[in-house]
From Swiss-Prot:
Membrane-spanning parts: 32-52, 70-90, 114-134, 165-185, 193-213, 238-258
Domain of life: Eukaryota
Origin species: Toxoplasma gondii (strain ATCC 50611 / Me49)
Region Disordered, residue ranges: 411-500
Keyword Lipid metabolism: no
GO MF annotations, alphabetized: high-affinity secondary active nitrite transmembrane transporter activity
Intervals, Extracellular compartment: 53-69, 135-164, 214-237
Regulation affecting activity: Inhibited by p-chloromercuribenzene sulfonate (pCMBS). Methyl methanethiosulfonate (MMTS) inhibits L-lactate but not formate transport. Inhibited by the Malaria Box compound MMV007839. Inhibited by BH-296, BH-317, BH-326 and BH-388 compounds.
Topology feature Cytoplasmic, residues: 1-31, 91-113, 186-192, 259-500
Stated name of the protein: Formate-nitrite transporter 3
Cellular localization per UniProt: Cell membrane
Catalyses which reaction(s): (S)-lactate(in) + H(+)(in) = (S)-lactate(out) + H(+)(out); formate(in) + H(+)(in) = formate(out) + H(+)(out); pyruvate(out) + H(+)(out) = pyruvate(in) + H(+)(in); acetate(out) + H(+)(out) = acetate(in) + H(+)(in)
């Protein structure tokens, strides 16, 4: 079993949630119905097993309540295994994933509401179908032992106070969302099964309240005539359980880990081997570009609106051959308050010209897919074939990883703990255009070299508007002065004779 580290798992959770918004409503609803059916089928199997064991002390073969509860819990994870591996939509897990995407501005509130409503109603319909067609009509649970078990379970669930039921539901969906997190972080089937099994068993043994499981159990009890009544079930169980599940998934898991990891750069480059940068590793390249975007490259992104420079379409990869404009020299609104001399000073301030080609990437529209361009040899711009999901920022083409080893003199490095956020350093693989495949020497066939690998890397820096660690009070003038001093020192070190 291979588990991704927490930041990587968080990135996967975001991508997992974004994919849910791509589903058509009819398919979303159908998958939600199937999830409800899977929960109902597992609930039927658990009830058939646990109800077959008596807890009456007068019975010599009686088992304890704890044993009966564990028998029920041991089979219930089968429902979640079916849901994960078939791609069905379970409302309780969606509370976490969709909220994280909403807080990251990857989905709209409307998309979240559509997903929640469709998945909840579909889960209810699926659980109702399973309770009637798979449990009630076959008559498997109509013997006295199973009816007595159903009656006890229904009575216990509806005798709880509103606060008790709410708190039990909070704990339940915390376990469920952690199971979803573990599954997303796992890379193999066995790891997914093992990582989800124990949280699901735990919430069943703990007696927590799961709204979809209660849909099946209480509706099944009502159909068999051992339930307390429809109104009592809705008011005493369904409503507090639903609210508690939402609070548990959104509050104790989704919002907490969004706060811990936000912002995360989810730029998925066409890379052979992603190389994560150490948070504390000195990197003047990373820092200078982060400072640049911090002061002059912000985007005031609002839901449904992309506040981007005029060349945003090119920067977003819409053109495969035309080179994007250099963000350091752009004349758009993001850099309008910068004089030509200041822009030149910033460009020269990057040690060794390591990041001469910096691209301002606009925040993607909701759904978040764009193709960030990469550069191979000089003048050869292209876009990777794999879609990337990102929050916008500055993409910098770095000619050599050695450029990242210089020590930063930026004031932001001293005043902020981790100003670079979740950066990814990836080796780029560049596809040459058809015009560039023409033979450079006589005797070679046209198109003989369709691909070339270039030892180049791409940095992605998130905008400061969505970064809690970079202080906003740093003055532009002080940064420009620091950058000019750094540029002069660098020039003196590289060309000492020029000062004579």
């Amino acid at each position: 079993m291979v588990l991704a580290a927490s930041p990587e798992a968080y990135r996967k959770v975001i991508e997992y949630g974004i994919k849910k918004t791509k589903l058509r409503i009819d398919r979303l609803f159908l998958q939600a119905i199937m999830a409800g059916i899977y929960v109902g089928m597992a609930g039927h199997a658990c009830t058939a097993l646990a109800g077959a064991y008596s807890t009456d002390p007068a019975n010599p073969l009686a088992v304890s309540k704890a044993t009966q509860k564990f028998l029920y819990a041991s089979l219930f994870p089968v429902a979640f295994i079916a849901i994960i591996f078939t791609g069905a939509e379970l409302f309780t897990g969606n509370t976490m994933t969709m909220l994280v995407c909403l807080l990251e501005r990857r989905v709209t509130a409307l998309q979240l509401c559509i997903n929640w409503i469709c998945s909840l109603v579909g889960n209810w319909a699926g659980a109702l179908f399973a309770a009637y067609f798979l449990s009630y009509l076959p008559g498997v649970l109509q013997d006295p032992d199973h009816l007595h078990y159903l009656e006890d379970v229904a009575a216990h669930k509806t005798e709880l106070s509103f606060l008790q039921c709410f708190c039990l539901a909070v704990g339940c969906n915390t376990f469920v969302c952690l199971a979803v997190w573990f599954v997303i972080a796992s890379d193999d089937a066995a790891g997914k099964i093992m990582s989800m099994w124990f949280p699901i068993v735990s919430f069943c043994v703990a007696g927590y309240e799961h709204i979809i499981a209660n849909f099946y159990t209480l509706q099944c009890a009502l159909m068999h005539g051992v339930g307390p009544g429809v109104g009592t079930v809705i008011l005493k169980n369904f409503i507090p359980t639903l609210l508690g599940n939402i609070v548990g998934g959104c509050g104790l898991v989704g919002a907490v880990y969004w706060y811990n990891f936000y912002p995360t750069v989810c730029v998925v480059q066409e890379a052979r081997q992603p190389l994560p940068l150490s948070e504390n590793a000195p990197s003047s390249t990373r820092q200078v570009v982060a400072d640049l975007f911090s002061l002059w490259g912000r985007e005031s992104s609002t839901p449904g609106v992309s506040a981007s420079p005029p060349d945003a379409a090119t920067n977003a990869g819409c053109s495969a051959l035309d080179p994007p404009r250099n963000a350091l020299l752009a004349a758009g609104k993001n850099f309008g308050n910068l004089s030509a001399g200041d822009r030149g000073a910033l460009a020269e301030g990057i040690p060794g010209g390591a990041c001469e080609d910096c691209l301002l990437v606009p925040r993607a529209s909701f759904g978040g897919e764009y193709h960030p361009p990469q550069q191979g040899d000089a003048g050869r711009w292209c876009k990777p074939s794999k879609a990337a999901v990102g929050s916008g920022g500055v993409l910098c083409h770095v000619q050599s990883p050695a450029a990242l080893e210089a020590v930063s003199n930026s004031p932001l490095r001293e005043n902020s703990g981790v100003p670079s956020g979740g950066l990814l350093l990836c080796e780029g693989r560049v596809r040459r255009s058809s015009r560039e495949r023409e033979p450079e020497r006589g005797g070679e066939e046209e198109g003989a070299s369709p691909e070339e690998d270039h030892p180049a890397v791409t940095l992605s820096i998130p905008p400061t508007d969505f970064h809690p660690h970079v202080p906003r009070e740093v003055e532009q003038s002080s940064l420009l002065e620091e950058t000019r001093v750094a540029a002069e020192n660098s020039a003196l070190e590289e060309h000492p004779a020029s000062t004579i």
